[in-house]
Amino acid sequence: IEIFGVGGSKMLSQGLKPIFNIKFLSIMGIFEVLLKLPKILKLLKLTKRKIIEIKPDIVITIDAPGFNLRLQKSIKSLNVKQIHYVAPSVWAWKSYRAKKISKFLDHLLVLFPFEKKFFIKEGLSTTFVGHPIAFDDNFDKNIYNVEKSLNDKLLKKIALLPGSRLGEIKKLMPVFIKAAHLLNKDYKSIKFYI
C-alpha cells in the first residue's frame, strides 16, 4: 500500500508521501484565509493534479472542510471512492451542507453519534467512529483529576479554549493567560483548565 497526501509528522512517520506541507493549511480567520487564498488555491489544484496522476483507489480526507470538501467535490468525476473523516458541524449551522456533501462523498466518518442522522437522512453512508481524545491513554487519568478538582465546591472553574490550530493558539493563548493572571489577582478561588 502506498499512501500519498497532506499530513503532519505522525502521518509522515507512518509512511505518508507528502504532496505539500500541512502547515500551509493551518490558518485561522477570514483575514488570514484571504491573505493566503492564492496559495491555498494553488495547493488545491496541485493536490487534484496529483490525484489524477496517481489514480488512487480511494481518497480519504480528514477535517479541514474548507480545503478538503472542495477537493472532494472537484474530483467527483474521477470515479474514485471518497471518504471524509470529521463531519462539518451541520447540526450547529449551515445544515444545508449535509445534502451538498452527500452528492460527492461515498462515506463519512463522524466523531459523535448524534451526527449520523443528519447525513443518513441525505442518503450518505455514515459511520460513527468516536472522538480520538477518547482513545488517548491518559484520557481516563486526566478526566479523573479534572472531575476531582471540579467537585471542589469552593473553587470557581474557568475553561480556557484557545482552539486546535497553531495559529489560533499562538494568537489566543497569550490573551487568555493575561486574563487568567488578572482574574487570579482578585479572585484566589479560581482554577483554570486548558
Task: Please give the residue ranges for each predicted region.
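Charged active-site motifs of nucleotide-sugar-dependent glycosyltransferases
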Residues: 151-159, 190-191
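Active-site and donor-binding regions of nucleotide-sugar-utilizing enzymes
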Residues: 1-146, 160-173, 182, 186-187
